[in-house]
């Protein structure tokens, strides 16, 4: 109910009705009052005119009694006529009840003295009681000299008339006026409602449009064709709606781009407001925050508080377990609506970079050592032969064998470095051919038969000789050579090394499994990284460069396949190679 009363249509309609009703009431009151006054004045003027004529008739008549009787015949019923010579000496014996009361009014009302003494016309309303009811009459006294008396200058012609006819006329006029006002008010009500609805229709359309705009719907644009202020308001609102839509679209696009950029960042991003609440975060930040410990959280909170105090950019390193982060906090003047400030936290995972840097350092140290050792041996044994220190043929032969072995070792190290450099510069190319896998595995069997016997290892090859794979013979030879060499380093006499073939619907699978020392879990994710070495697990043979498994991974991926490792410390390691089947 209250919502309807608050409607502009109802308010405008009620306003029009109130104004029209007020005007009609005032006009009706004025009209009724005027008509009452008009008819009363007309009646009074008519009575006065009758009194003047009777006075003139009686004055000019020779037979005054006949003139009076004639006048009474004309005036009486419904009115009455009295001609009084002396108000103080009148007989009431032959008068009717009404005339007696009229005469009593004339005698007792001092206003009528002006008729006899001053010759003025006097009019009064007189209430007469007759037969238990009251009736109002108009009584007019008019001076005349038709019958002089010794007590007064003038005689008086008194005419009275019943006002009931005037009251009936006034009542009829009042009823007609009220009925007319009601009819006019009814018509005005309907017209006012129609007019207010018509006038406010554009406003209601604008209200609906404003509601839709507040809900995010900018497609509704009502057409208001009027040339008045409402039409101008509609045009301005439509233009404003279009501009708002454009701005919202621009903001949405900007927000989507910003969110996409933030979510695609490799750094974790957090937005912190003055209440120290997170108002913005990307997936990387969520992952980091879910996995950090309480000490790291305390570290972040301290840095955030320091940034709020200094209002400067802070950059600090955070080490947590085996991971390394760089935390950057920047103060922002306005990060929320209302001009509230905050801090943007950027957490970058530098673990890979740190490990890579560490591996480079280790690589330089290892390569320096690996190069220095064979070079020192080459120099030492050759100097011994040249200087004649070693003269026995068997000793010379043994020294030359050591020189040859160290030369091969140095050559292998240099080749690995050159291969990696060539891969970085030119990329890796493979020439795949559809050929039996047995050709590769037979080659490996022959190559490592003697080495397995020397090391006391049980090396087995299980494969289907008729099965064909799509691979590059030379590249896969390089891969298996590296993996079998590594397996021999991880094992001890009596352990097993098994090379097994398998397949699924889309891939050919090769397993290289050993029962050696295994690899610790913290190293598994990094064994294929460049320069990475698990030195603690190496128990036999010469030191490597940390590039072998990295090269293996590049070769397998260039084949369109994948290489993975599973290991359990103390129980052994399995490398799994998957290559796409020939088309």
Swiss-Prot record:
- Which positions fall inside the Histidine kinase domain? 366-583
* Keywords linked to the UniProt accession: ATP-binding, Cell membrane, Kinase, Membrane, Nucleotide-binding, Phosphoprotein, Transferase, Transmembrane, Transmembrane helix, Two-component regulatory system
Q: How does it sit in the membrane?
A: Multi-pass membrane protein
Main location per the UniProt record: membrane
Query: Which reaction(s) are listed as its catalytic activity?
Result: ATP + protein L-histidine = ADP + protein N-phospho-L-histidine
The record's listing under SUPFAM superfamilies reads:
ATPase domain of HSP90 chaperone/DNA topoisomerase II/histidine kinase (SSF55874), HAMP domain-like (SSF158472), Homodimeric domain of signal transducing histidine kinase (SSF47384)
Q: Which residues lie on this side of the membrane: Cytoplasmic?
A: 1-11, 196-583
What triggers or suppresses the expression of this protein? Activated by SrrA. Expression is maximal during the postexponential phase of growth, particularly under microaerobic conditions.
Provide Extracellular-side residue ranges: 33-174
Per the entry, what this protein does is:
Member of the two-component regulatory system SrrA/SrrB, which is involved in the global regulation of staphylococcal virulence factors in response to environmental oxygen levels as well as biofilm formation. Also plays an essential role in host-derived nitric oxide resistance by regulating hmp/flavohemoglobin, an enzyme that detoxifies nitric oxide by converting it to nitrate. Functions as a sensor protein kinase which is autophosphorylated at a histidine residue and transfers its phosphate group to SrrA.
What's the protein here called?
Sensor protein SrrB
Organism encoding this protein: Staphylococcus aureus
């Amino acid at each position: 109910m209250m919502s309807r009363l608050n409607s502009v249509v109802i308010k405008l309609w009620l306003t029009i009705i109130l104004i029209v009703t007020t005007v009609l009431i005032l006009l009706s009151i004025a009209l009724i009052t005027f008509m009452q006054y008009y008819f009363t004045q007309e009646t009074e003027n008519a009575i006065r005119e009758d009194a003047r004529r009777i006075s003139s008739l009686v004055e000019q008549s020779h037979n005054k009694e006949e003139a009076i009787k004639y006048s009474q015949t004309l005036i009486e019923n419904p009115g009455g006529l009295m001609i009084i010579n002396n108000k103080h000496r009148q007989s009431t014996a032959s008068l009717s009840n009404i005339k007696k009361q009229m005469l009593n009014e004339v005698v007792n009302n001092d206003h009528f003295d002006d008729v006899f003494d001053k010759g003025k016309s006097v009019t009064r309303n007189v209430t007469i009681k007759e037969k238990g009811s009251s009736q109002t009459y108009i009584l007019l006294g008019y001076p005349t000299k038709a019958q002089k008396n010794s007590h007064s200058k003038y005689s008086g012609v008194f005419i009275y008339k019943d006002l009931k006819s005037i009251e009936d006329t006034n009542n009829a006029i009042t009823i007609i006026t009220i009925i007319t006002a009601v009819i006019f008010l009814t018509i005005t009500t309907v017209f006012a409602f129609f007019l207010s609805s018509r006038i406010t229709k554009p406003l209601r359309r604008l209200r609906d449009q404003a509601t839709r705009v507040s809900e995010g719907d900018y497609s509704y644009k009502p057409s208001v064709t009027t040339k008045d202020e409402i039409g101008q308001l509609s045009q301005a609102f439509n233009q404003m709606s279009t501009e708002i839509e454009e701005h919202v679209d621009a903001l949405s696009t900007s927000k989507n781009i910003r969110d996409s950029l933030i979510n695609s960042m490799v750094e974790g991003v957090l937005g912190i407001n003055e209440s120290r609440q997170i108002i913005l975060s990307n997936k990387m930040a969520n992952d980091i925050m879910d996995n950090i410990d309480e000490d790291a959280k305390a570290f972040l909170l301290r840095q955030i508080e320091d940034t709020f105090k200094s209002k400067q950019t802070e950059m600090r390193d955070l080490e947590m377990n085996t991971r390394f982060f760089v935390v950057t906090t920047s103060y922002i003047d306005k990060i929320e609506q209302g001009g509230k400030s905050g801090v943007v936290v950027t957490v970058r995972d530098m673990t890979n970079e740190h490990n890579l840097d560490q591996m480079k350092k280790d690589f330089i140290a290892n390569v320096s050592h690996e190069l220095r050792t064979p070079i020192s041996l080459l120099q030492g044994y050759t100097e011994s032969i040249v200087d004649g220190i070693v003269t026995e043929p068997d000793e010379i032969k043994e020294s030359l064998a050591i020189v040859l072995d160290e030369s091969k070792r140095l050559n292998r190290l240099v080749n690995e470095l050159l291969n990696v450099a060539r891969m970085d510069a030119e990329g890796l190319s493979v020439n795949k051919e559809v050929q039996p896998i047995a050709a590769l595995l037979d080659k490996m069997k022959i190559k490592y038969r003697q080495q397995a016997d020397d090391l006391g290892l049980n090396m087995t090859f299980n494969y289907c000789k008729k099965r064909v794979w799509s691979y590059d013979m030379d590249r896969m030879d390089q891969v298996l050579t590296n993996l079998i060499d590594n397996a021999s380093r991880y094992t001890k006499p009596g352990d097993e090394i098994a090379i097994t073939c398998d397949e699924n619907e889309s891939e050919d699978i090769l397993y290289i499994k050993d029962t050696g020392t295994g690899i610790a879990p913290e190293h598994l994710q990094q064994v294929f990284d460049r320069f990475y070495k698990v030195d603690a697990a190496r128990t036999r043979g010469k030191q490597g460069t940390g590039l072998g498994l990295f090269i293996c991974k590049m070769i397998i991926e260039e084949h369109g396949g994948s290489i993975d490792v599973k290991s359990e410390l103390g129980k052994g390691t399995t490398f799994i190679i998957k290559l796409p089947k020939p088309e």
